[in-house]
Amino acid sequence: MSFNASTSDWAGYLANEPWAGYVERVKQMPASRWAILALVNAPVLAILFNALWQKIAPRKATDPPVVFHWLPIIGSAIWYGNDPIGFFQTCQERYGDVFTCILLGRKVTVTLGVKGSNFVLGGKSTAFNAEGAYTHLTTPVFGKDVVYDCPNEVFMQQKKFIKFGLTTKNFPRLREDDRGRGGRIYAQGPKEKEVREGLNKSFSQLYSDLDGGFTPLNFLFANLPLESYRKRDRAQKKMSDFYVDIIKRRRANPDAETHYDMIESLKEQTYRGGAALRDHEIAHLMIALLMAGQHTSTATLAWTVLHLASRPDVAAALYQEQVERFGNADGSFRAMEYEDLRHLPVLDSVIRETLRVHPPIHNIMRQVREDVPVPASLAAPSSKSGNGVYVVPKDTYVLASPIISQLDPRIWVNAHTWEPSRWSDSAGVAAQALRTYTDEAGEKIDYGFGAVSKGTESPYQPFGAGRHRCIGEQFAYLQIGTIVAALVRRVELRLPTKVPEHNYHTLILMPKDPKSVHYRRRRFD
């Protein structure tokens, strides 16, 4: 049918159309068509309603500002998951240091900056609970009755037991074997050998399967009918049995040649009530020690090697320090001892700068067990919203992100640049941040695992702060320093590309691909 676009023609055309039958046709539409329409339109309506509700819903004056999000339930999870640092920095500019975001149905209040970290990490465990935030992730991997699968006061005692086994008197046992070109690093002693001999290829596979339980998916869902979850559970059982068998053999033969290792140390420990650690608790603590320490050290080593390969000048200074301190007349090197690490400023600066730019854990979360007011010095409602304070409500979550302070250009010069020399300036920001973090001359707090500096008010917190500060901090410096020194003694490093960006799709902050490093041996034996 042809017609022109005049008003009279349109009126005649529309008058002849059977509009009255339209309703009847809709009524006769099959149910499958209705289902398709509902399936297509329901998400759109949900998104529109969610956006509208955020604009018109009444909000308490004490509620922190909420990050606008289009997708209900999912909230800001996609943006946060792909680029948490960019997400936090953008929200910080828009909302300030305190704001709330929705992450897959969880209401999470983020507190940024030095004061924000102090608010969360320095808070009381009765208010900010780590167990509620992480037990669903750690318990299937570590095992029952340890770490976050027990009351906080019990966990603090367990940290004390492990810390006792990691005292500096045991550090000299870790040293480099220079008798072969491999330069292997290991702990000495017959009973450590008993454990090492069990670390064969099958154990490596168990470790890999158990490591598969430390992913963002596992953080979101503790149990799913997936093969990776089944492998995780089987590996946890076999690895636990491995350690329990060693413990039982030692208990059955107490007169055998002994050497002080971590298992032996844990066997001697007792809780405050006098109860000794049970065999499965020792086994699960050994798994926790293995898994927790390996991830963070591996990440730090990877970033250190990448940066040394990209900065030949720093690598050369590091090598020269090794020559001056440990070089022999024939061009070889003597082995490093623990005390030597205290006198290697270049190596120390390299490790500290790597931890500043690439802290293994960039976000720390807690479950809120009671309503907690936010200090006005951190953030407060504007005069238009009221004269009170923000309150983080019970049964939600709080999140601190120390990396935001560690990369804050208002604190650090060239904040995003890896520059170890900043740590050699005794009057600089880095040295001051380190003094605040270690606070060697200040007041110490005993959270239950020995007196430590609080460290929550420093802009540099690579090992956490407060009651959950990492107890393996000194051991990590020893381990990383020994491996880096062994590496630069043997090879020259070059990076064919730029230093990779952060991979935020892993729980630990690892580099993205490609991350290949070229090397050349310094000498051939």
Q: At which residue positions do the language-model features occur?
A:
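N-terminal membrane-proximal hinge/A-helix region immediately C-terminal to the signal-anchor transmembrane segment
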Residues: 2-144, 148-157, 164, 172, ...
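Cytochrome P450
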Residues: 3-43, 102-109, 170-184, 190-201, ...
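Cytochrome P450 catalytic-domain "roof"
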Residues: 25-32, 81-109, 130-150, 159-189, ...
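Cytochrome P450 I-helix active-site segment
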Residues: 66, 257-261, 309-363, 368-370, ...
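Cytochrome P450 heme-thiolate monooxygenase catalytic core
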Residues: 130-136, 173-301, 317, 338
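Cytochrome P450 heme-binding "Cys pocket" and the immediately downstream C-terminal segment
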Residues: 312-314, 455-469, 473-511
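Conserved cytochrome P450 K-helix/beta-meander segment immediately N-terminal to the heme-binding cysteine loop
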Residues: 358-363, 382, 400-450
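C-terminal helix/juxtamembrane-tail motif
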Residues: 508-525
